[in-house]
């Protein structure tokens, strides 16, 4: 008798081939789910908005993984592997819903000599499916003044208030300036600025004109507003760009990828700004 008989499942040896087959099936399922969800998103404003909500919360997730979370548990807020939850002394419910995402694995060389990265399927669980469901971290509320100030810092161009302007805010690429109309409510100011800052980032990063990036800037603004709890009822996704319905999945994900990158750039700069301007008392409490 071996001492290893005390381990549960000791009578059933680990079958590497069976494990690999299960992982391959999960990976295949994930890619099929991505393609199917993209098809839904290209035709449905509700599905598209649902994806944006997820990508806004998980701004560091790849587009593929945000799509997967959107399809499986769009209300998720904090995802970890079983082992990571356990290491934090948090226990996953027995009947917890599994969410499959993809993680990069090994680099390989394609037949044409270019490099590629293979991906493995990974199972994660949302905090709502664990013993820590009542300990979810609520985002510290930010004042509209803090948010507007951070957005100004995140802008690659100056933001200049003016008395006369047809729109609430407007990015003028020829002057490399965002003009903002005076007298706006705080929320209208933030919402309109978020779109124009996005347009400016698109201009600088992708050399896209304000007109060319209009809808994508609209989407980035929605994600920024959604993340910080600003009212998003004014955003309408009932009519998506006509070209989306004609795109293949890869091209569509490319569009989403630029939105995710612009969002990440704005979020990163806003975070740095708010950390820099955080009251000294709050910084001391965090130590």
Protein language model regions, located:
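N-terminal accessory/interface modules of nucleic-acid-binding and processing proteins
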Residues: 1-287
